């Protein structure tokens, strides 16, 4: 078993073994994010689903109102005049068959891959290299589209794709420690609403099993999901 560092042990002793109200949890996570860099704030959510069944899979996108605080590199596989459109829209990598070949050789210097529908037969051949990294374009994720410019703009602005892994756990980076608690809360609330809205049709029993927040170098804090779901902004 991996030993906890002295710093982590010290921080963990400040956290009680209970669920916290969302804003209280965010305050604790921010306070403990005291590394020498701007730590990323993450949500780790275990859902009552078994993704080996197609009707219990969760994969979608969410546009966080305050962005993620992270810059992402976007690659676009398209053809014809769309290549120039991808370049002008801010894509970091763009191309046709040449980019397909480059990726097939293992050149994966990007965080997100967008493709136009006409190129998907060629992109499908990259499943062996893209699949394990979760980079295969998908219509549900908004990464297979004819409107390249809008897709690039949205993802650069903070739209992100998330999915439940094989264990039914969702891992999402939704902000930075430098964000205000309210900005983080708005992002977190938007994420919660997206997960509820996209609940798989085959999900059975209790949907939200556990919900933890943490920072890159900090301990985790359990969140009261009911308090988050029930929150209503003051009118």
From Swiss-Prot:
GO cellular component, one term: large ribosomal subunit
UniProt xrefs under PROSITE patterns: RIBOSOMAL_L1
Role, per record: Binds directly to 23S rRNA. The L1 stalk is quite mobile in the ribosome, and is involved in E site tRNA release.
Organism: Prochlorococcus marinus subsp. pastoris (strain CCMP1986 / NIES-2087 / MED4)
Subunit structure comment from the entry: Part of the 50S ribosomal subunit.
NCBIfam families, sorted: rplA_bact (TIGR01169)
Gene it is expressed from: rplA
A GO biological-process term: regulation of translation
Pfam families, A to Z: Ribosomal_L1
Superkingdom of the organism of origin: Bacteria
Keywords: Repressor, Ribonucleoprotein, Ribosomal protein, RNA-binding, rRNA-binding, Translation regulation, tRNA-binding
Family membership: Belongs to the universal ribosomal protein uL1 family.
InterPro entries: Ribosom_uL1_bac-type, Ribosomal_uL1, Ribosomal_uL1-like, Ribosomal_uL1/biogenesis, Ribosomal_uL1_3-a/b-sand, Ribosomal_uL1_CS
HAMAP family noted in UniProt: Ribosomal_uL1_B (MF_01318_B)
Ranges that cross the membrane: none
Protein name per the record: Large ribosomal subunit protein uL1
Keyword match Ribonucleoprotein: yes
Example GO molecular function: tRNA binding
Record carries keyword Transmembrane helix: no
């Amino acid at each position: 078993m991996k030993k906890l560092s002295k710093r982590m042990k010290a921080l963990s002793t400040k956290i009680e073994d209970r669920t916290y109200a969302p804003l209280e949890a965010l305050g604790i996570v921010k306070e403990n994010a005291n590394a020498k860099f701007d730590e990323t704030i993450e949500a780790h959510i275990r859902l009552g689903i078994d993704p080996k069944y197609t009707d219990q899979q969760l994969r979608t996108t969410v546009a966080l109102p305050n962005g993620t605080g992270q810059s992402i590199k976007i690659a676009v596989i398209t053809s014809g005049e769309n290549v120039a459109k991808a370049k002008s829209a801010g894509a970091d990598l763009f191309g046709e068959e040449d980019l397909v070949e480059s990726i097939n050789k293992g050149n994966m210097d990007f965080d997100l891959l967008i493709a136009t529908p006409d190129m998907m037969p060629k992109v499908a051949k990259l499943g062996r290299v893209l699949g394990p990294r979760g980079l295969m374009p998908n219509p549900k994720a908004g990464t297979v589209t004819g409107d390249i410019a809008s897709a690039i703009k949205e993802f650069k602005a903070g739209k992100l794709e998330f999915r439940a892994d094989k264990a039914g756990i969702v891992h999402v980076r939704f902000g930075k420690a430098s964000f205000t608690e309210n900005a983080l809360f708005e992002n977190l609330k938007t994420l919660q609403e997206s997960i509820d809205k996209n609940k798989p049709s085959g999900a059975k029993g209790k949907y939200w099993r556990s919900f933890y927040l943490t920072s890159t170098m900090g301990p985790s804090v359990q969140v009261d999901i009911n308090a988050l779901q029930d929150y209503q902004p003051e009118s």
